[in-house]
Amino acid sequence: MSRVCTMTGKKANNAYAVSHSHRRTKKLQEANLQWKRVWWSEGNRWVKLRISTKAIKTIEKKGLAVFAREVGLNLNLY
């Protein structure tokens, strides 16, 4: 399974690791993804999602149903 947030679509960023002597090697900066069980009140059940920590904060602020509607996510599939 790829490391992509189901709500925001966040994924890894290509970057350089720069040493003290300024040698550059490629590295991946992965998104901080968590498996999170969130209560979906409209569906009256738990939904298990792989989401970023920023998406967790947004769900706490707006609510799961509103945020899913904004990003166009069908919660019946989860």
UniProtKB/Swiss-Prot annotation:
<dbReference type="Pfam" id="PF00830">
    <property type="entry name" value="Ribosomal_L28"/>
</dbReference>
<keyword id="KW-0687">Ribonucleoprotein</keyword>
<dbReference type="GO" id="GO:1990904">
    <property type="term" value="C:ribonucleoprotein complex"/>
</dbReference>
<keyword id="KW-0689">Ribosomal protein</keyword>
<dbReference type="InterPro" id="IPR034704">
    <property type="entry name" value="Ribosomal_bL28/bL31-like_sf"/>
</dbReference>
<dbReference type="InterPro" id="IPR037147">
    <property type="entry name" value="Ribosomal_bL28_sf"/>
</dbReference>
<dbReference type="InterPro" id="IPR001383">
    <property type="entry name" value="Ribosomal_bL28_bact-type"/>
</dbReference>
<comment type="similarity">
    <text>Belongs to the bacterial ribosomal protein bL28 family.</text>
</comment>
<dbReference type="GO" id="GO:0006412">
    <property type="term" value="P:translation"/>
</dbReference>
<dbReference type="GO" id="GO:0003735">
    <property type="term" value="F:structural constituent of ribosome"/>
</dbReference>
<dbReference type="GO" id="GO:0005840">
    <property type="term" value="C:ribosome"/>
</dbReference>
<protein>
    <recommendedName>
        <fullName>Large ribosomal subunit protein bL28</fullName>
    </recommendedName>
</protein>
<dbReference type="InterPro" id="IPR026569">
    <property type="entry name" value="Ribosomal_bL28"/>
</dbReference>
